[in-house]
């Protein structure tokens, strides 16, 4: 993988002081929350050396590298925030709205309001009066979005590992709630746990 840099942010820093990357983790799983993170790096920041030179879209990184990157991101960022929306809310308002809610909560939780939001994906509904840009594949293109993707993913993985201790039969520490063959078979044998999303139907189990 080619190392990422703050090229996109440099262009924007001419006009915006605090450029905030936002991404989520957990839209697709059958269980657990959706988690979003917001990250603002200092103006003119560049990852010249160290572990942040290895930053990329969290899906392209190993779990161990994500765990190394997360504290470095928190240390180098001007400010950051992580917010989760639980499975019950997902079932009540749907996963798209829950994802928007998590992203907005992350942006609102920052100790200093950003001047521009960079959102991974192609849609966003803001709750705060801040301009934004949506960027398809932004977690592989924009440094601050990639950083947000790592914080969101590592926090969600941590939460699912805690759930695995309460519901060990589902293997959440391995599948993070995603619909792996092992996970679907566990649902077939044991039924859904209290943290499963009831609005997500399983064709493998004949659900429609």
From Swiss-Prot:
PROSITE patterns: RNASE_H_2 (PS51975). Manganese or magnesium. Binds 1 divalent metal ion per monomer in the absence of substrate. May bind a second metal ion after substrate binding. It catalyses: Endonucleolytic cleavage to 5'-phosphomonoester. Pfam families: RNase_HII. One of its GO terms (molecular function) is RNA-DNA hybrid ribonuclease activity. HAMAP family: RNase_HII_B (MF_00052_B). This is Ribonuclease HII. It comes from Chlorobium luteolum (strain DSM 273 / BCRC 81028 / 2530) (Pelodictyon luteolum).
